[in-house]
Amino acid sequence: MSVHIGAEKGQIAETVLLPGDPLRAKYIADTYLENVECYNEVRGMYGFTGTYKGKRVSVQGTGMGVPSISIYVNELIRSYDVKNLIRVGSCGAIRKDVNVRDVILAMTSSTDSQINRVAFGSIDFAPCADFGLLKAAYDAASERNIPVTAGNVFTADQFYNDDSQIEKLAKHGVLAVEMETTALYTLAAKFGRKALSILTVSDHVITGEETTAEERQTTFNDMILLALDTAL
């Protein structure tokens, strides 16, 4: 066991899907996995292991924000030797050519978080996705005829934030805003693991269009299928 994950050694697969919402973790396990075992309920942050098309896969909720996902990614890697980490989360679009419910493959992540300033000082470390996972997800999207956009996202430290920088980010090609990817990619790089964020646009910062909480929990199925196919 680790501090925040109650699993025994061997209960967690080498590949783990990482939804922020623990109820999305339960939805994924109930809907897509077979032979499911719940290995974690600590703090209500559910974790499950099962099989998808014969491949052993785990799903672990992470909570919201850089500090929370950092706890779970650290423990999954250091205590359970997880090799592949695939975030399945929501994001807010900041460009007019990106629509609500679109799927984004995050190639890299800019941020206003201090996580990398603390680690690297004045150096601007640019964390990126694992190319093998990125390519696998892109190929899976092509096979399933699921449109995807690959590019830069922005990991914000605040959910309710000043929008003054949004226009500048959009002009520089940033597709959407979320709260975890920089931490995931930085920790994967630190420990020599593979990571990818697959995101569904849940709301649009510019137009104001948004999905409901229930939709965010249970209907982002294209993203989930791509993540599971990538796990194979």
From Swiss-Prot:
Its EC number is 2.4.2.1. GO terms for cellular component: cytosol. Phosphate binds at residues 20, 24, 43, 87-90. Disulfide bonds: none annotated. One of its GO terms (biological process) is purine nucleoside catabolic process. The active site is at 203 (proton donor). GO terms for molecular function: purine-nucleoside phosphorylase activity. Keywords: Glycosyltransferase, Transferase. It catalyses: a purine D-ribonucleoside + phosphate = a purine nucleobase + alpha-D-ribose 1-phosphate; a purine 2'-deoxy-D-ribonucleoside + phosphate = a purine nucleobase + 2-deoxy-alpha-D-ribose 1-phosphate. A purine D-ribonucleoside binds at residues 4, 178-180, 202-203. InterPro entries: DeoD-type, Nucleoside_phosphorylase_CS, Nucleoside_phosphorylase_d, Nucleoside_phosphorylase_sf. PROSITE patterns: PNP_UDP_1. The record marks 216 as: Important for catalytic activity. It comes from the Bacteria. Catalyzes the reversible phosphorolytic breakdown of the N-glycosidic bond in the beta-(deoxy)ribonucleoside molecules, with the formation of the corresponding free purine bases and pentose-1-phosphate. Belongs to the PNP/UDP phosphorylase family. Homohexamer; trimer of homodimers. This is Purine nucleoside phosphorylase DeoD-type.
